[in-house]
Amino acid sequence: MNEPTVSETLNSQKPIVFSGAQPSGELTIGNYMGALRQWVKMQDDYDCIYCIVDQHAITVRQDPKELRKRTLDTLALYLACGIDPEKSTIFVQSHVPQHAQLSWILNCYTYFGELSRMTQFKDKSARHAENINAGLFDYPVLMTADILVYQTNQVPVGIDQKQHLELSRDIAQRFNAIYGNIFAVPEPFIPTGGARVMALQDPEKKMSKSDDNRNNVIALLEDPKSAAKKIKRAVTDSEEPPRVRYDLEQKPGVSNLLDLLAGVTGKTIPELEAEFEGQMYGHLKSAVADAVSGMLTELQERFHYFRNDEILLNKIMAEGAAKAKARAQITLDKVYEAVGFIAHP
């Protein structure tokens, strides 16, 4: 089967989607249900570009050996979740230098005050007070370059990245106002039915791979038995008699368990409420633990299949980077001409 040319790809009718994940920690079941599973569903209807954003990862100090391992782990997880290199462009950010090249130019069209207002910079600065570096401050501009260099139409974003996407739109519109229609202005993609998985011990906050309390987190690569134990210890509430019902305000812990079970089994929340009517919270926890541990076991089998084949992983990275570079260079050439750089002889 012949690969489409760059011009054929760019002229396709499918909207272009870009998204990525950092290889800086273990991906969680929250990442899977909220993002990766949505990415898989989008592959047939969108022109999908999925990146492993290793350059973003080093805004926080990384062990080099561990970063290389986690980059390959993340790629294998992408594949295990169902992201298909025949349908999507999959690559590692540092393999495509056009991201960093465009990022520098966009820095010159981004204001200090805009970056100062980014809440994620404030949060990360507080957590990493010993290493408040320029890259951490400038992170949203590299994210903007990641998006704009592919003429992205839609970006799947969570609440924590919504402010960054708004900045990306502002930068694109500002640049276009000066130089003409150079960039597509990206829109947020709001997935339907994507569960927002919350922390098991603190169900009013989102599950995060960087959470210091590991009892809050279910990693995709952790021992399924460990995951089951965490679920059985998850916070519920003290309602008497116990009622298994979905109520984010009054019953965040129970609602989170129902979201998890719905996400894994495909059942609706009303179906699950009916199924557990009159039952104790322990019954719900056992059902969630069994479903999640079963899902993790199957996912990890697929992960190890891909992770143990580094020849295949290297091939996918090389082919993905080649496709991404060709597409990114088209945009970069337009930008270079617009700002007045002399074409490379």
UniProtKB/Swiss-Prot annotation:
Its main location: cytoplasm. InterPro entries: aa-tRNA-synth_I_CS (IPR001412), aa-tRNA-synth_Ic (IPR002305), Rossmann-like_a/b/a_fold (IPR014729), Trp-tRNA-ligase (IPR002306), Trp-tRNA-ligase_bac-type (IPR024109), Trp-tRNA_synthetase (IPR050203). One of its GO terms (biological process) is tryptophanyl-tRNA aminoacylation. GO terms for molecular function: ATP binding; tryptophan-tRNA ligase activity. A motif ('KMSKS' region) lies at residues 206-210. Transmembrane segments: none annotated. The keyword ATP-binding applies. Gene3D superfamilies: HUPs, Tyrosyl-Transfer RNA Synthetase. It catalyses: tRNA(Trp) + L-tryptophan + ATP = L-tryptophyl-tRNA(Trp) + AMP + diphosphate + H(+). Its EC number is 6.1.1.2. L-tryptophan binds at D146. It is found in: Cytoplasm. One of its GO terms (cellular component) is cytosol. Keywords: Aminoacyl-tRNA synthetase, ATP-binding, Cytoplasm, Ligase, Nucleotide-binding, Protein biosynthesis. The keyword Signal does not apply. CDD domains: TrpRS_core. A motif ('HIGH' region) lies at residues 23-31. Homodimer. Belongs to the class-I aminoacyl-tRNA synthetase family. Catalyzes the attachment of tryptophan to tRNA(Trp). NCBIfam families: trpS. This is Tryptophan--tRNA ligase.
